[in-house]
Amino acid sequence: MRQHVNPLSQFFQLPLSLPSKNILFEKSHYPIHLDIGSAKGEFLIELATKYPDWNFVGLEIREPLVSLCEKKRRKLELTNLKFLFCNVNVSLDEWLSDLDFGQLKRVSIQFPDPWFKRKHFKRRVLNTNILNSIAKSMSKDGEIFIQSDILKLIEYMTNTIDENRYFTRKNVGDLRSIDKNPYDVMTDREIFSLKKNLLIYRVMYIRNSLLFTN
């Protein structure tokens, strides 16, 4: 399986109509935690098991991983969790518009593909359009949590969110002031990085009270 896929390739520019929350979940009114780039899904599987009164959605651009995650989820009979194949740059905004305002409580973006070359920066998952889609759906005090073991990438991500007026950084200054995953569950990459004694940079943003305007 390819580690990285180009989200700007023609195939991934085709918009997908994702299932609505009422189709995805038995209890569709529960608050939602959205994990962008859910990889092998262990992070969300553990969260969904621990917190049955939340709904969890994992979005992943690598379709074979989504199939693998869904197989695990069905085996565990987790009805508050779904993994969906999509390119968030193309399909996220429409799906979020189906949610009740404020239902989206948490968004996590953890160890995303770095795309190191400057000419490939536009392939990175986080951008102004995605942030605005999230801001439009999220009410005051909603969370965006990001983490990476690559300093240049976390700096790029924080700069991108800092420029967005709808989110306020919680841990200003030190990129290492959050010493563990705030959701008390680690991703596979997080576990790997800690075993290798790599530095992990974590930043939490809070949706402020500013009303969204186009």
UniProtKB/Swiss-Prot annotation:
S-adenosyl-L-methionine binds at D35, E60, N87, D113. CDD domains: AdoMet_MTases. InterPro entries: SAM-dependent_MTases_sf, tRNA_(Gua-N-7)_MeTrfase_Trmb, tRNA_methyltr_TrmB_bact. Keywords: Methyltransferase, S-adenosyl-L-methionine, Transferase, tRNA processing. Substrate binds at K117, D149. GO terms for molecular function: tRNA (guanine(46)-N7)-methyltransferase activity. The active site is at D113. It is an enzyme of class 2 (transferase). Disulfide bonds: none annotated. SUPFAM superfamilies: S-adenosyl-L-methionine-dependent methyltransferases. GO terms for cellular component: tRNA methyltransferase complex. It catalyses: guanosine(46) in tRNA + S-adenosyl-L-methionine = N(7)-methylguanosine(46) in tRNA + S-adenosyl-L-homocysteine. Its EC number is 2.1.1.33. It comes from the Bacteria. Pathway: tRNA modification; N(7)-methylguanine-tRNA biosynthesis. Belongs to the class I-like SAM-binding methyltransferase superfamily. TrmB family. Catalyzes the formation of N(7)-methylguanine at position 46 (m7G46) in tRNA. PANTHER family: 3-DEOXY-D-MANNO-OCTULOSONIC-ACID TRANSFERASE/TRNA GUANINE-N 7 - -METHYLTRANSFERASE, TRNA (GUANINE-N(7)-)-METHYLTRANSFERASE. This is tRNA (guanine-N(7)-)-methyltransferase. The gene is trmB.
